[in-house]
Amino acid sequence: MNNINSNKHISVRLEDAVDSLNIQKDKIYVDCTFGRGGHSFEILKRLSSKGKLFVFDLDLDAKKYFDNNFSKFKNCFFIQDNFKNLKENLAKFDISKVDGFLFDFGVSSPMLDNANRGFSFKLDARLDMRMNQNQELSAYEVINNYSKEKLIQIFWKYGEIRNPVPVVDEIIKYRSNKPIETTLELVDIIRKRTPIKIQREKKHFARTYFQAIRIEVNDELNSIRKALSDALNMLSKNGRIVTISFHSLEEKEIKNTYKDVLESKIPKEVPINNSFDFKIIKIKPKRASSSELEENNRTRSSFLKVIERVNE
């Protein structure tokens, strides 16, 4: 198989994630977060010409990368849409059952590293954070047009910030004179109302604010919930869903979505032998290894989880 130019991008948990799919060479798989194709290429290496791989990504740059590097693979199909619409899109290919889904949640490294995309709190750019460059809502609209109450809500809910009020007050004060246009402009505003002690911590003080804005702009948690629910329903017997998550909110969505298929609604004291259609596959390590951390520090917060359908 031909090598793929990855532009030095290293996919998170590459071997662990693809190994966990337990790939059968003639089956159907879906990489729900194509990015720069690291996971997809590894999956394709394990498929025969009869096997099929469908990949999803909203990003225009990801589509260009696919066209330049993956169009040669006749059993690989790019779908430019949010993975929350996986069921509807796969139906267009007459696909109702899938043998494995891979989700690598959050923002991709190429998006973070491209200053023009406005995701990074370390690189100066216009506030954007859109995974889908064609949508209207961006970080600029959120920061400059949302009410005080709504900003407080998203920072508390999506950033898990205990008291975002001082920072929100500073945002409202600043934007009353001029729009907040760039990422570093926003970082400076956050800094003004962040205690020195927190500014000196290892994790960047603006990280959770940017996370909250990004989740709001891209409706990430609702997308995860719908996609996982549909993936569970479409999964073939012995098929697996592999998720790579990066923070507690993503992990909570995964746990809550799986809860209905893993927990019995029948009280324990009722003498009925419960059988479940799904089981969690225990993977070691759930966290990235030290060697992978040396190659890609962004794997530090990654968490791998695998669920398998055991009954139709």
Swiss-Prot record:
Gene Ontology MF terms in the entry: rRNA (cytosine-N4-)-methyltransferase activity
Return the similarity comment.
Belongs to the methyltransferase superfamily. RsmH family.
KW S-adenosyl-L-methionine (keyword) present: yes
| PANTHER family reported in the protein's UniProt record | 12S RRNA N4-METHYLCYTIDINE METHYLTRANSFERASE, S-ADENOSYL-METHYLTRANSFERASE MRAW
What class does this enzyme belong to in the EC scheme?
transferase
Q: Do you know which InterPro entries this protein is assigned to?
A: RsmH, SAM-dep_MeTrfase_MraW_recog, SAM-dependent_MTases_sf
A biological-process GO annotation: rRNA base methylation
Q: Which domain of life is it from?
A: Bacteria
Q: Which GO terms describe its cellular component?
A: cytoplasm
**What is the E.C. number?**
2.1.1.199
Q: What is this protein called?
A: Ribosomal RNA small subunit methyltransferase H
Keywords from UniProt, A to Z, are: Cytoplasm, Methyltransferase, rRNA processing, S-adenosyl-L-methionine, Transferase
The entry's localization annotation reads: Cytoplasm
**Where is S-adenosyl-L-methionine annotated to bind?**
37-39, 57, 83, 104
Q: What's the encoding gene here? A: rsmH
This protein's record includes keyword rRNA processing = yes
**Reactions listed under catalytic activity:** cytidine(1402) in 16S rRNA + S-adenosyl-L-methionine = N(4)-methylcytidine(1402) in 16S rRNA + S-adenosyl-L-homocysteine + H(+)
Q: Which SUPFAM superfamilies match?
A: Putative methyltransferase TM0872, insert domain, S-adenosyl-L-methionine-dependent methyltransferases
| Physiological role | Specifically methylates the N4 position of cytidine in position 1402 (C1402) of 16S rRNA.
Organism name: Malacoplasma penetrans (strain HF-2)
